[in-house]
Amino acid sequence: MSKKTFIFVVTTVVMSFFAAAVLLAGTTVQDTFKMESKEYKTRKYNSATLTHKKHVEEYKANCGECHHDANGKPLNDIKTGENVQKCIECHKIPSRKPKKKKGEPKLTDEQRRAYHAEALHDNCKVCHKVFNKKVKKETGKKGKAPTSCNKCHPGGKIK
């Protein structure tokens, strides 16, 4: 192998490692993070904090329990470093659903979940309630997964 070819191969390999590092750097998930979206102009409650590492390691939650595709199919095979869309990218309306007025038809589940806050609440609260029931059944003690506004939104309502 010529010296030029050798230098080219080594340079290509080194550059590939740098490119991989740059691509993966922005896709690692933090251990905990606030469930915030810049799309919200105003908030009624302080942002909830997700303890991602705790959910995965302690509670053994798999990816598909929270993450799903556009058809609601669980994404169970997410790998570390993969880009994952934020909820707001599909659940595009940055608010809770409007209060139903007398005579108006009830929203379908699909229509309701277009509202970002409704989709998040469905995802988190349903799972937390199931978890708490399981703990109660197995131990006789109340489960600690939060299901009320003030437990998930520290400080509660924004004044």
Map each language-model feature to its residues.
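Bacterial N-terminal signal peptides
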Residues: 10-20
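Short sequence/structural segments immediately N-terminal
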Residues: 2-6, 21-159
